[in-house]
Amino acid sequence: MEAKGLTPILNVSDIASTVAWFEKWGWKKLWDWGTPPTFGAVGSGEEACIFLCQGAQGGRGRGANTTTFQQDGDEAGDKGVWMSVWVDDVDEMHKQCVAAGLEVTFPPTDMPWNVREMHLRHPDGHVFRVGRGVEAKK
């Protein structure tokens, strides 16, 4: 049997402020549950969806590691979740995030593994590697 999808669940400190954070870089609130909300979801496009759980289901917290190119494993001190988000234009997304005052920890860069990427950190410590594939240099 094959999986039909995968939806990460992020432990966040506040559903409403996290939804607002995602909206700053183009995501939309899909739904929330509870009064006040303690669970919800944001989405982008046809397929991308992330569940948000206030204070449960996984870790959160800011580590000292701002990119993936520093320490390994437990030494990194990361408590949040790292995810890759694929977009059409990394540079345009970077401009949008900077204009919205979001924390970009690594600017758009062509990496040796044929991906142009930037890193964006959520206030609860989760890091998003925003990227797109690029042609291999010959």
Segments (PLM) and residue ranges:
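Short C-terminal beta-strand
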Residues: 127-131
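Alpha-helical macromolecular-interaction surfaces
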Residues: 16-17, 92
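Vicinal oxygen chelate
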Residues: 1-9, 24-121, 132-138
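Conserved active-site tyrosine of GNAT-family acetyltransferases
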Residues: 18-22, 97, 125
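Short, surface-exposed ligand-recognition loops at beta-strand->loop->(often short) alpha-helix junctions
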Residues: 11-13
